[in-house]
Every structure is written in structure tokens, then in C-alpha cells.
Amino acid sequence: MSTPTFVHRTVLLTEAVDALAIRPDGVYVDCTFGRGGHSRLILSKLGPSGRLIAFDKDPEAIAVADRLAAEDSRFNIVHNGFETLSAELARLGVAGVDGVLMDLGVSSPQIDDGSRGFSFRFDAPLDMRMDTTRGVTAAEWLATADEADIREVIKTYGEERFARKIAAAIVAQRDESPITTTRELAVLVGQNVRTREPGQDPATRTFQAIRIFVNRELDELKAVLPQAARLLNEGGRLAVISFHSLEDRIVKLYLRDVSSEEKLPAWAMVRAADMAQPPIDLVGKAIRAGDEEVRENPRARSAIMRVAQRTAAPWREGDA
């Protein structure tokens, strides 16, 4: 049987790479290689002395990246989560970089490959791991987690108002027989979510929540942001593409904190010119996909990109 081919459209492709303001001799990081759309465009803008290091947890993405690394000596791939950014770059002898790109969330090939268990559109083993070589599957977690933990995950990461009812139904069902497939979970959720948001399957929020939890997506995002910012050389840029409000909120709040001028009490006799300047500047407003891109790739509709740049100012006490 032939292996299915999945078309992956990279979201905000040119906008993200343009935001990095690529220097031909610079060192850049693509924290989420995926199928290499952003990485290939970055490489096309680098000169012979430029360098790109990419990260991914998905073995299928690593297979694609390995082929690219064999063709281009300027490119390195790291099979690890981006929360290991500082340690992995140190291992590669990289002390600072000129740009970091993060394209968060699950990729189109992962969603469209029914065997991965990310989507309720297919009947498949309930896996949801981005790295299928390690960790606990969604089915394994649902089989052992406390009802309260299931409820909290669905409520927090899915922003699902029916979390309590869904969690109770999951526990009741697993007492009869384990929930092992995407279809079983989707049907169960659909039976317990009475309202329907226009154009959205009732299982959408629950699947999102469990996927985020199984892959520790938000924890890893919180861990990598300060690492990426501190690795930037002066003038280096950080570009982060988010796909839902939970991710974007973390990015927005972190960048706001490190780009804010130092706050002093009103009575402090300090000239504005003498105040400590922030180590990070925000670059423009948040960027969204244009109408044409959304028409060609509906998944781009929820994408939002925030960009920041390292200043010459030193990191201040209290900066993350």
C-alpha cells in the first residue's frame, strides 16, 4: 500500500521570513520545522556563511529535514522539542542568533493523517502525540486520569463550558470499556455537548485540549520564549505565529513584559533618558493572514504573528 501524500501549506510564509529581516551571514532558528516551508525560504535568503538550525519532535518531519540537511551544509536539524533551545544550541556551539521563528500548534499533515489521532474526522487510534517515539498517548491518559484532572484540562486548554459533563461521561464510559479511538471520543463528546457553534464540530474544543495537554504545548511555549529572547544578538528578531487565544495570550504577555520601560515610583527624580531601556522592542502590530491566503488555506484564518527585536539594552533584573 502506498504512503498517503499530504499537502502542507505554510501559513504566513513570506510574512514570517520577511519579519526576521534575514542577514545573508546570519544564524537563524526555525523552532518548528514541520515540512520545511519556512526553513527553505530562510535558506534561500542566506549566503554561504549563513546558518539555520531547526527543531521538531515529529519523526515524519525529521525524515524530511534529514534529506534537506544532506543537501545543504548550512542546515542542521534537532530532533527535540524547542523547550531545549538553549541547551541544544550550546551543544552545537551557537552562543547567539540573529532570528528565531516559531510556528506553533499542530501542522496540516499531522491533522490530515488520520493514523496520528489528532482529528475527529477520521477513525483512528487515539494517540495525539507529536513525537510518536515517546510519551503517553491520549488514550492512555484518558484511561487513568482522575475525573477532576480531565475536567480541568478540557476546561483550561479547550475553554469548553461543558467540561464537567464531558469528563463525567468519559469516566463513565471507560468503566464500561476503554476509549481507544478518535471516533469513540468524538461521538461521546457529541452526545454531551448540546449547543453547536456555527461551523465547529462539538468535539473540537475537547480534542484541542487533550492534544495541548498530551504534548505540553503551553508549558513548552512558556519555557522557550525567554530562551529565544536572550539568545538574540542585538538587532535580532523573534517572530511567533499562534493559532488560538491560549498561545497568543502567552506570547503577547511575555513580549509586553520584556518590552515595557522600567517602572519607577512617581517620586523618583530620574530623567527619562536615564531610565533603563527595555531589552526587547515590539515590531509593528500583530499580523494576520490576508484574504487571499485564507481563501486558499482556511486554517490560516486563526493565525496571528507577533514580532519583536532585541535592543542594545542589557537585560534588567526581573526580566524573564
Swiss-Prot record:
One Pfam annotation, family name? Methyltransf_5
Give the GO molecular function terms: rRNA (cytosine-N4-)-methyltransferase activity
Catalytic reaction annotation:
cytidine(1402) in 16S rRNA + S-adenosyl-L-methionine = N(4)-methylcytidine(1402) in 16S rRNA + S-adenosyl-L-homocysteine + H(+)
One Gene Ontology term from the biological process aspect of the record: rRNA base methylation
What name has this protein been given in UniProt?
Ribosomal RNA small subunit methyltransferase H
SUPFAM superfamilies, per database record? Putative methyltransferase TM0872, insert domain, S-adenosyl-L-methionine-dependent methyltransferases
Job of this protein: Specifically methylates the N4 position of cytidine in position 1402 (C1402) of 16S rRNA.
HAMAP family registered for this protein in UniProt:
16SrRNA_methyltr_H (MF_01007)
The family database entries (Gene3D superfamilies) matched by this protein are listed as: Putative methyltransferase TM0872, insert domain, Vaccinia Virus protein VP39
This entry carries the following GO cellular component terms, namely: cytoplasm
Q: Which NCBIfam families match?
A: 16S rRNA (cytosine(1402)-N(4))-methyltransferase RsmH
The record's subcellular locations are: Cytoplasm
